[in-house]
Swiss-Prot record:
The complex is composed of two ATP-binding proteins (HVO_1886), two transmembrane proteins (HVO_1887) and a solute-binding protein (HVO_1888). Residues 1-18 have a biased composition (Basic and acidic residues). Residues 36-282 form the ABC transporter domain. It is an enzyme of class 7 (translocase). Keywords: ATP-binding, Cell membrane, Membrane, Nucleotide-binding, Translocase, Transport. ATP binds at residues 68-75. PROSITE patterns: ABC_TRANSPORTER_1, ABC_TRANSPORTER_2. Residues 1-33 are annotated as: Disordered. It comes from Haloferax volcanii (strain ATCC 29605 / DSM 3757 / JCM 8879 / NBRC 14742 / NCIMB 2012 / VKM B-1768 / DS2). Coiled coil: none annotated. Transmembrane segments: none annotated. The keyword ATP-binding applies. This is Probable anion import ATP-binding protein HVO_1886. It is a peripheral membrane protein.
Amino acid sequence: MTTERPDAGDSGSEKPDETAAPDPAANGARRSKTRLAARSLGHGFGDGAVLEDISLAVEPGEILAVVGPSGTGKTTLFRLLAMFERPDEGTVEVGGDDVWDLPEARRLAVRRRVGMAFQTRSLFSTTVEENVSYGLRVRRSWSARVRDAVEGLFGRDEPSETVRDALRTVGMFDKVGRDAGSLSAGEAQRVAIARALAPDPDVLLLDEPTSNLDPRNTAAIESAMRAARDRGIAVALATHDMQQARRVSDRTAVILGGTCIESGPTDAVFESPDDDRVRQFVEGKLVY
């Protein structure tokens, strides 16, 4: 059973720098975002349960860290949240709708409002620009607005402003014309995150996005998470790095043994957890 902690204190002519991250204030006209929630999720493979009775939510304009040791079901949870698989039990809700109760066409439209970058960095053998543009090109089959925005994208001499913004957010605009195959692992992950951000999702799911990366790339990705949050995107981060969770997240959910046993404001979860197992885990005394 999850212990939910209440939030504490609810309360000139100069040429622009092309590599600078976009100003969140400039995005005031963006449509409002929606929340993503899981209710009593259960899922397994064969006879074994991987997840049991998981309930959590990520709100627009916040970063939720889902922490737990490797192999505890975080990736499976994120695949369910991204609607790649249907849960055996419980519901996934976007904007209050149970996505698996929606007609298929509506569910696919809702799915496209959720961006995800996996721990395994998979890019196409094209340029950085074309990789980031991919998500927009997929969307044009169902959205006239996006279709008009990206029509002829690959034939342009300059990348679209949408692609520019996404690459600025992850600090990769200077690599826009590079072949993706020439990037380092950290640079490739940053491009994958830019690709997830380009369609302006309501929700961004990041599964261990900085695993085995150097400090420079880790810092750039953490900066991108904060920028996405400042744009009103609901950001969920799966990580076993508790220090990272403390640096970037507003709230934290702790997964142990396939169950969410505590969630709440990050400082409260780490400094005064209600569950003894969480206390032992954050102190490095509990091993799964």
